[in-house]
Curated annotation (Swiss-Prot):
Its EC number is 6.3.2.4. The lineage of its organism: Bacteria, Pseudomonadati, Pseudomonadota, Alphaproteobacteria, Hyphomicrobiales. ATP binds at residues 168-223. Pfam families: Dala_Dala_lig_C (PF07478), Dala_Dala_lig_N (PF01820). InterPro entries: ATP-grasp, ATP_grasp_subdomain_1, D-Ala_lig_Van_CS, D_ala_D_ala, Dala_Dala_lig_C, Dala_Dala_lig_N, PreATP-grasp_dom_sf. This is D-alanine--D-alanine ligase. It comes from Methylobacterium sp. (strain 4-46). Residues 139-348 form the ATP-grasp domain. Keywords: ATP-binding, Cell shape, Cell wall biogenesis/degradation, Cytoplasm, Ligase, Magnesium, Manganese, Metal-binding, Nucleotide-binding, Peptidoglycan synthesis.
Length: 382
């Protein structure tokens, strides 16, 4: 019997387009013999959730601007309220796969709605998603857990920061300015003088009202690990990968990631001494646990080639990209876990976590929702 899977994609975020690409790869990785996939597109401008036609095997979802609006019903056990020419209630979905990047999708908002709906979903819950999304909060939690982080300052509406102040506090003239709640390097700038700094702040404030100002780590190597939590709760860490940006870009920004096909080289596995790779992988697992993550995450670290102790946890991404150049699926593929098996593992974790929540009274069993919604038999054709 195939499981009914809702694939959430799009979203009201600057990473909307990246989500669409990721969703196509996730859809193709879901075994059609095991899963019946129904995409739900989230409009970038309005935030409306719209039901898409079920996918044929190998088909990628496409953004739709018309069609029925939908919402998961609180206490509905995975049922959708469908508002088209008439109103109806869908048959329940067994699991939701959110392929959403950035605010309004990766930050705990959607996860909270899915918890209220009583439906299993892939990835971290509300706390882990929200904590990892806010880079300031994440760094505080990791620092409190004894993890090494790059020194930084926070700027915002009530806290202005001048370039001279940042240089003195962070002991570096070269700084990174970035929105606290954004991914895919959107809004990130590298600066080395006051003019660049002011421009970078204005650019970052276009995406968020909280801004991080970080000390640059000269010639830092960016090492990434894919973390996967099994259905039994075991936290597994992949071999390391390395991002080597092209010299023309200077750092791994949005253009290097998604615009320039030669913007960076992905080195899998990264060339690290075994002991160093093990140490950095251990830090990745600790970061995953410090932020209360679940299911999956990509953990990015910096390695200072001039300092044997220069290892820093940069950030934790709880819904990493699944594009053709995304490190998370590539790392697991290189470790022998192909995308279809990876998706099987993620869905198994989602179902097992939800079952544990039911067993401890933190979620209602599907049977309770079935009984409550039995009078409403009208459903959409899927």
């Amino acid at each position: 019997m195939r499981r009914n899977v809702a694939l959430l994609f799009g979203g009201r975020s600057a990473e909307h387009e990246v989500s669409i690409v990721s969703a196509g790869n996730v859809a193709r990785a879901l075994d059609p013999d095991r899963y019946a996939v129904t995409p739900i597109a989230i409009d970038k401008e309005t935030g409306a959730w719209r039901l898409c036609p079920p996918l044929a095997p190998g088909e990628a979802p496409a953004m739709v601007r018309e069609g029925p609006r939908v919402a998961f019903l609180p206490g509905g056990g995975g049922r959708l309220a469908v508002l088209g020419e008439t109103a109806s209630v869908s048959e329940p979905f067994d699991v939701v796969v959110p392929v959403l990047h950035g605010p309004n999708g990766e930050d705990g908002t959607v996860q909270g709605a899915l918890d209220l709906a009583g439906v299993p979903y892939v990835g971290s819950g509300v706390i882990g998603s929200a904590a990892a999304m806010d880079k300031d909060v994440a760094k505080r939690l990791m620092r409190d857990a004894g993890l090494p982080i790059v020194p930084y300052l926070v700027a915002g509406p009530r806290r202005g920061v001048a370039y001279t102040e940042a240089v003195e506090a962070l002991e570096s003239r070269t700084l990174f300015v970035k929105p606290a709640n954004m991914g895919s390097s959107v809004g990130v700038s590298r600066v080395a003088d006051a003019g660049q700094f002011d421009q970078a702040l204005a650019h970052a404030f276009a995406y968020d009202e909280k801004i991080l100002i970080e000390r640059a780590v000269p010639r830092a190597r960016e090492i990434e690990f894919a973390v996967l939590e099994t259905a039994e709760g075991e936290v597994r860490v992949s071999p390391p990968g390395e991002i080597a940006p092209a010299a023309a870009h200077g750092f791994y920004g949005y253009d290097a990631k998604y615009v320039d096909p030669d913007g960076a080289a992905l080195l899998i596995p990264a060339s690290l001494a075994p002991a160093l790779a093990e140490r950095m992988g251990g830090l990745a697992a600790r970061a995953f646990e410090a932020l209360a993550c679940a299911g999956l995450a990509r953990v990015d670290l910096f390695l200072d080639p001039d300092d044997p102790e220069g290892i820093f946890v940069n950030e934790v991404n709880t819904l990493p990209g699944f594009t053709a150049i995304s490190m998370y699926p590539k790392l697991w593929d290189a470790a022998g876990l192909a995308p279809p098996a990876l998706m099987d593992a993620l869905i198994a974790h989602a179902l097992a976590r939800h079952a544990r929540a039911v067993a401890t009274g933190r979620a209602a069993p599907r049977s309770a929702a079935d009984a409550a919604w039995a009078p409403m038999r009208e459903s959409i054709s899927r």
